Amino acid sequence: MKIAQIQMAVSADKETNLRRAGELLRQTAAGGIDVGVLPEMFCCPYDNKCFDAYSEPEGGPAQQALSALASELGIYLIGGSLPEKTDGKLYNTSYVYDRRGHQIARHRKVHLFDIDVADGQRFFESDTLSPGREITVFDTEFGPMGLCICFDFRFEELARLMTLRGARVLFVPAAFNMTTGPAHWKLLFRQRAVDNQLFTVGTSPARDTAASYTAYGHSIVCDPWGTVLRQCGAGEEIAVTELDLERLDAVRRQLPLLSARRTDLYRLETEN
């Protein structure tokens, strides 16, 4: 399965961002890919002051553009995330489209990014956004895939539940910052890959030091052994990676962590 991560620069103009996403996806799809992945808030500055103004309802123009791109290019498209407004509430939402442009998944960020690091980053998504309430795993011709957004990925229970629901790859549109990125970005993607014996794919916006929130960049792919297969730099970049899904099965046979769990002693429970 060949994936393309679009680590794009995000401007203050929504239409410009949508056009740029299309340009970069068309550029890489010409070489043949199966899945395109955009970053968190790819069409909106990551700023509480912007989320409402840039938001759109379910089926809005940005979503229509993503659907059309997936159909035009014949790819699965993980549309990063964008501000969605439904029933007066704002969500940080990722939409997924199949090769025909049909929406096959929607993930609303479950864990809102509320942090205040001494001498570092301060941000409170809960000032404007509401949390989602669903764990997201979707089917493809390559098997089930998991999807979460940025801060969601820090919670090991969520990754494990997606794994137990069959996910073979965890796709994570994310915008870590210059406080948390250098400290935790690579560590977390390797850790989740090793713990759950699957591929992890983190796709960030490009770094913009003039923005009110500076993304770390360094989009990353790790395999089920924790090996970093690909890592971008800080600027705008397209990263194409071939995922050998048989590698996942081999690692799980050789080091059978999931089947060795003592579910008679411990287990995860969810309330639906």
Q: Language-model segments: what does each one mean?
A:
Residues 14, 22-106, 115, 176-196:
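Cys-nucleophile CN-hydrolase/nitrilase-fold catalytic domain and related Cys-dependent amidase chemistry
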Residues 16-27, 154-160:
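Short, acidic/polar
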Residues 3, 96-104, 222-230:
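Short, glycine-anchored, charge-dense loop/turn motifs used at functional sites
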Residues 246-272:
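A short C-terminal boundary segment appended to hydrolase-like catalytic domains
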Residues 58-78, 144, 150-239:
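CN hydrolase (nitrilase-like) catalytic-core segments centered on the catalytic cysteine
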Residues 1-8:
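Short beta-strand segments enriched in small/hydrophobic residues
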Residues 85-165, 178-187, 254-257:
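Active-site catalytic loop in hydrolytic enzyme cores
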Residues 79-80, 93-96, 136-138, 219-221, ...:
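Short beta-strand scaffold segments in enzyme catalytic cores
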